[in-house]
From Swiss-Prot:
CDD domains found in the cross-reference section: homeodomain
Protein name as catalogued: Homeobox protein Hox-B9a
Protein source organism: Takifugu rubripes
Lineage per the UniProt record: Eukaryota, Metazoa, Chordata, Craniata, Vertebrata
Entry's Gene Ontology cellular component terms: nucleus
Gene3D superfamilies registered for this protein in UniProt: Homeodomain-like
């Protein structure tokens, strides 16, 4: 087959298949399977005795090649360590070293939740099977809290422990004076406690007031000594009695 034009002197032997090319291709790439058209397409563009290639590519499309899977480069027994460590004794994947935690025996194991009561002396929980049930949270105090251990002490129920704790409302009902927010209700003034006069003292003071509305210092001392009162109490009583009399005189209608 000849090509006219500028490349008239060159021949394209794309149709002619060379057995030597097929042999070399099969020996170089044993895993790749080529068809007859692919070998013809590979031979396209080669001219006899020159490095000049055809400017026009072959119009036929290249067929898909089927590749066989190659074996892995490293086998499963390969290890990144040196050979003197022994590849057979180490696993394929390296795991970090974790120190083993000491697990106590079943006799010395002591399981305790933060809801439990404090241990009483040297009491120890015995007879349990080692299985602990899930406990509800503190928000569900109304529900039943199951016993965590079969040999738990009957008096160490978490509900009873919770009831032993002092509550704010119950504490206020018992002693409200201890609460700082209720101190203003029971605040004590700096004044002395009011002591009312007896009937005898009131009667004698009324007699003295009718005799004289104002007492001298000496007379006030005598009245206070006779009635077993202080001079200040006698003075205050006379002041209050005068104010009462003045108020009564204002309330009376004028004729």
């Amino acid at each position: 087959m000849s090509i006219s034009g500028t490349l008239s002197n060159y021949y394209v032997d794309s149709i002619i298949s060379h057995e030597s090319d097929d042999l070399t291709a099969s020996t170089r790439f044993p895993s790749v399977q080529y068809s007859g058209s692919s070998s013809a397409a590979a031979a396209n563009g080669r001219q006899p005795g020159g490095a000049v290639h055809a400017e026009h590519p072959h119009p036929e499309p290249y067929p898909s090649c089927s590749f066989q899977p190659k074996p892995p480069v490293f086998s499963s027994s390969w290890s990144p360590f040196s050979p003197h460590h022994g590849a057979s004794s180490l696993p394929a994947v390296y795991h970090p070293y974790l120190p083993a935690q000491h697990v106590p025996s079943a006799d010395t194991r002591y399981l305790r939740s933060w809801l439990d009561c404090a241990p009483r002396g040297s009491e120890s929980v015995q007879g349990h099977t080692g299985q602990v049930k899930l406990e509800p949270q503190l928000g569900h105090l109304g529900g039943e809290i199951p016993a965590k251990l079969s040999g738990q002490h009957p008096h160490d129920n978490p509900r009873t422990c919770w009831s032993r704790r002092p509550r704010l409302g119950f504490h206020l009902l018992l002693s409200p004076s201890d609460d700082p927010s209720a101190n203003w209700l029971h605040a004590r003034s700096s004044r002395k406690k009011r002591c009312p006069y007896t009937k005898y003292q009131t009667l004698e003071l009324e007699k003295e007031f009718l005799f004289n509305m104002y007492l001298t210092r000496d007379r006030r001392h005598e009245v206070a000594r006779a009635l077993n009162l202080t001079e200040r109490q006698v003075k205050i009583w006379f002041q209050n009695r005068r104010m009462k009399m003045k108020k009564q005189s204002k309330d009376q209608p004028k004729d």
